[in-house]
Amino acid sequence: MKVISNFQNKKILILGLAKSGEAAAKLLTKLGALVTVNDSKPFDQNPAAQALLEEGIKVICGSHPVELLDENFEYMVKNPGIPYDNPMVKRALAKEIPILTEVELAYFVSEAPIIGITGSNGKTTTTTMIADVLNAGGQSALLSGNIGYPASKVVQKAIAGDTLVMELSSFQLVGVNAFRPHIAVITNLMPTHLDYHGSFEDYVAAKWMIQAQMTESDYLILNANQEISATLAKTTKATVIPFSTQKVVDGAYLNDGILYFKEQAIIAATDLGVPGSHNIENALATIAVAKLSGIADDIIAQCLSHFGGVKHRLQRVGQIKDITFYNDSKSTNILATQKALSGFDNSRLILIAGGLDRGNEFDDLVPDLLGLKQMIILGESAERMKRAANKAEVSYLEARNVAEATELAFKLAQTGDTILLSPANASWDMYPNFEVRGDEFLATFDCLRGDA
């Protein structure tokens, strides 16, 4: 970590804790800043704030009092989940207090080069794939960012010989000014988080900030399957490397079932460790990064063939009596489940789906359900899911929760079948988040394996 004097003796307000705020507070204190942390969670329910106070850092909890900004703060570091129309943020902007993001703070002190990955879908899987391939090739890749390891914490241990492989959300990118990765990946761009950004155009603009400071000596990897990529590519100074599953491009591409990089065959799609058309895209982006980083083809192929997925994201859990289980609890919308289904033989597949009822009809999912062996349906959206199953002429059973659904699926399954949890719905009708929902699937698998 570079020790810089930019923040020494500067009064800095950390707005919002969580993991990133806690890490930023500790980093800035180490750099000699005079830090105040403000978090909305009450102090007696806030172990992170309590720990910071014990370290001598000033904390103010329970609300975000606008009058706090009457103090002469020289910077604000904003939690990425707090929008720019928050009263505290608006007041800071009105007072012309510079607002930093936690990832940019990490960038300022990083000795290690950065590979940044953003996009609407596939960020976590692609980030993990890239780190795995780089490490398999003898490099030292450190996961950081939106993947659960705050960049401002990881950067404190990183040295010049490391590479920070950083997952970046639109929330983290919207406020960056100096941030410059050496390689950036945009997996795809879909209309998501519009409640935060206001419009698809503003959402894309936030994602596009990943390349704002890049030059021709840096590399930007874009999904050539999307028309928007061609438009965006004309506006960057970075060297663009495209990837595509639909056509041959001057980068990474799929052709006749083989993944290539610039005419060099790397791996067959059927040899990838994770199924689904979206994972072919993730693998192509990974191949592009790996080749730019000097990783040998055989190491790339071996690593991608053994990659078992990320927890809750089309994760291959294991087998019981030659019945394979996949945990895709992260699929909280129709598109994600469609992509998951694309990687399987429907005639040998039992799908567990359903969850929070957001008023969606599932007509778009019907073509992907055709030929399914069975569905197990659960949650508030069950009636709508049943209508989709009926239209696809797929038989189904109902379950009260994921555990019961998994047990039912296992009773119905035969040797060679696959059981897939891919709900196409959010979890909040029964579970606090998709992780808890997926953990119940994993726990049930462990019980079934123990009884087998």
Swiss-Prot record:
Pathway(s) the chain acts in: Cell wall biogenesis; peptidoglycan biosynthesis
Keyword line: ATP-binding, Cell cycle, Cell division, Cell shape, Cell wall biogenesis/degradation, Cytoplasm, Ligase, Nucleotide-binding, Peptidoglycan synthesis
Listed InterPro entries: Mur-like_cat_sf, Mur_ligase_C, Mur_ligase_C_dom_sf, Mur_ligase_cen, MurD
Residues bound to ATP: G119, S120, N121, G122, K123, T124, T125
Listed GO MF terms: ATP binding; UDP-N-acetylmuramoylalanine-D-glutamate ligase activity
UniProt entry tagged with the keyword ATP-binding: yes
Subcellular location, record wording: Cytoplasm
Gene Ontology cellular component list: cytoplasm
Class of enzymatic activity (EC top level): ligase
Catalytic activity: UDP-N-acetyl-alpha-D-muramoyl-L-alanine + D-glutamate + ATP = UDP-N-acetyl-alpha-D-muramoyl-L-alanyl-D-glutamate + ADP + phosphate + H(+)
Family under the similarity heading: Belongs to the MurCDEF family.
Biological function: Cell wall formation. Catalyzes the addition of glutamate to the nucleotide precursor UDP-N-acetylmuramoyl-L-alanine (UMA).
PANTHER family: UDP-N-ACETYLMURAMOYLALANINE--D-GLUTAMATE LIGASE
The protein's name in its UniProt record: UDP-N-acetylmuramoylalanine--D-glutamate ligase
